[in-house]
């Protein structure tokens, strides 16, 4: 594995691969890597000749009172985990490399940006779309791999690629979970031991609601809220349901629905969701445990 910090160093590493006709795969991250990130890198390595992983904590997607400075940074450990999973080129740029002239040009996202996480985080997805577009322009990958855990982000990035005619295939891979159902997340490190015991109940609430026979999205939301209201720690940020991937608000649906939540613990805001086929109410479409990475092979690209 080769580590680079500057865009010129990155281009030097990519030039040979392009000249040799190799397929380039890309996994953008904010670091604090875990098993979920590694599953994306492995899926990328199975598909592509050259695997590029970026580690960059993007300040533009954090609000003024959010956890930018508290976001975990562990570059030494990240290097080991990235290489172990199959990374060939690790790109760790500075703010000056990504925003050499400051925030003079940014992407403004309209569709799907003001619901779910975007409702309480104005400008968040503008920051996400801006940095992803910049990284795509730098790496120019054939494939880019994202986790379905951030389903809203995946939907927005797919639309970004479509709107800007970017020649990259977006591959969405199932959420990787701990054995108790908690979605793997860098923010889990900020949970207290007591909060860590409570956190798996978030996904349990979503799964219970997904099996409900109701066709009303508002009923699904209410069921989840009732489960969460009984938890001894933390508080609800939101529980919402939308058509997916359009993220349009509807009362009923006979297609795919995203039932999503955000929950605030003392120093960690966790998100989770489940995708529900409203014609098949036996549970969600996006379950994968940490010891079942074979399902990663079913990642789908658009």
Swiss-Prot record:
It is an enzyme of class 6 (ligase). It comes from the Bacteria. Keywords: ATP-binding, Cytoplasm, Ligase, Nucleotide-binding, Pantothenate biosynthesis. Beta-alanine binds at residue 61. (R)-pantoate binds at residues 61, 153. InterPro entries: Pantoate_ligase, Pantoate_ligase_C, Rossmann-like_a/b/a_fold. Pathway: Cofactor biosynthesis; (R)-pantothenate biosynthesis; (R)-pantothenate from (R)-pantoate and beta-alanine: step 1/1. One of its GO terms (molecular function) is pantoate-beta-alanine ligase activity. Catalyzes the condensation of pantoate with beta-alanine in an ATP-dependent reaction via a pantoyl-adenylate intermediate. Homodimer. This is Pantothenate synthetase.
